[in-house]
C-alpha cells in the first residue's frame, strides 16, 4: 500500500539532523553552545490523534528543522493537540507553553524568535497577532488557512484576518501557493486586504505553480526556491 502523502520527502535536499526529543517538541540545534535565534514550526490540522507518526516526525518537518540548523538557527517542531476545529484554544495553550520551553533552552536567545505556521495550523497565529510579544521577531505563514471553513465551529478569537489589525510592525512572511484550494486562497486574499488596510509589514512569496503542500507534492525548482527564500527572509529577521 502506498504511503500517505504527508510522508512524502521534503523537496529541498538537506542533510538531516537527528533531533533531540523533548516530547512534544523536537529540537534541531546547530553545532556549538549558542545562544542561537530559534524558529518554532507549527504544523497544520486538524489531525486525528490516531494518525501516526505525528507531524514532528514527518519528513517535511524534519527537513525544515534540519534546514534551520544548517543555517545556524535552532529549529523546533512542536506537536500540538489540534484534533478537531474545536481544539484551537487547547492547541494555542499548548503552543504558548512550548514557546516558553524553547525560549528557556540555554542554547536559545530568548529575544530572537520566529514562529512559522502551516496550513490549518495558521489560525493559531491569531494568538501572536492580537498582541505580538517583544521576543517575536517574525511570523511566517505557508499555504495558510486564515479563516474557518464554512460550517465549522471555531472560536472567533482564531481569525488571523481580523487579528492582523493588531500586528503593528511585526514582520510577516507569507508563502502563497498559486494552485491553492479556492476557499483557502480566498482567506489569504482577505488576510492580505486586511493587512494592507493597516499597513502591516507583509512579505509575500509566490509559488505560481505550487499546490497546497507544494513542499512535499511539487518536486520543482520553483518549490525549492520558495522554501529557500522563505527561510532566508525569516532568518534575516532574527539574526
Enumerate the language-model features and the residues they cover.
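Alpha/beta-hydrolase active-site loop
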Residues: 64, 85-106
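The feature captures the conserved acid-bearing segment of alpha/beta-hydrolase catalytic domains
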Residues: 138, 144-198
Amino acid at each position: 500500500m502506498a504511503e500517505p502523502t504527508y510522508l512524502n520527502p521534503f523537496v529541498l535536499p538537506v542533510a538531516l539532523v537527528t533531533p533531540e526529543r523533548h516530547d512534544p517538541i523536537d529540537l534541531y540545534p546547530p553545532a556549538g553552545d549558542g545562544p542561537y535565534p530559534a524558529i518554532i514550526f507549527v504544523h497544520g490540522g486538524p489531525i486525528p490523534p490516531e494518525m501516526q507518526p505525528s507531524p514532528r516526525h514527518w519528513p517535511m518537518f524534519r527537513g525544515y528543522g534540519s534546514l534551520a540548523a544548517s543555517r545556524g538557527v535552532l529549529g523546533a517542531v512542536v506537536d500540538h493537540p489540534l484534533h478537531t476545529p474545536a481544539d484551537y484554544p487547547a492547541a494555542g495553550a499548548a503552543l504558548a507553553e512550548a514557546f516558553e520551553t524553547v525560549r528557556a533552552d540555554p542554547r536559545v536567545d530568548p529575544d530572537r524568535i520566529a514562529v512559522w505556521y502551516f496550513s490549518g495550523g495558521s489560525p493559531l497565529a491569531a494568538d501572536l497577532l492580537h498582541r505580538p510579544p517583544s521576543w517575536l521577531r517574525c511570523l511566517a505563514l505557508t499555504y495558510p488557512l486564515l479563516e474557518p471553513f464554512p460550517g465549522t465551529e471555531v472560536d472567533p478569537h482564531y481569525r488571523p484576518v481580523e487579528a492582523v489589525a493588531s500586528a503593528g510592525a511585526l514582520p510577516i512572511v507569507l508563502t502563497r501557493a498559486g494552485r491553492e484550494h479556492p476557499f483557502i486562497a480566498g482567506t489569504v486574499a482577505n488576510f492580505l486586504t486586511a493587512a494592507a488596510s493597516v499597513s502591516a509589514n507583509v512579505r509575500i512569496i509566490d509559488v505560481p505553480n505550487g499546490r497546497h503542500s507544494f513542499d512535499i507534492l511539487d518536486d520543482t525548482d520553483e518549490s525549492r526556491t520558495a522554501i529557500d527564500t522563505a527561510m532566508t527572509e525569516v532568518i534575516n529577521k532574527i539574526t
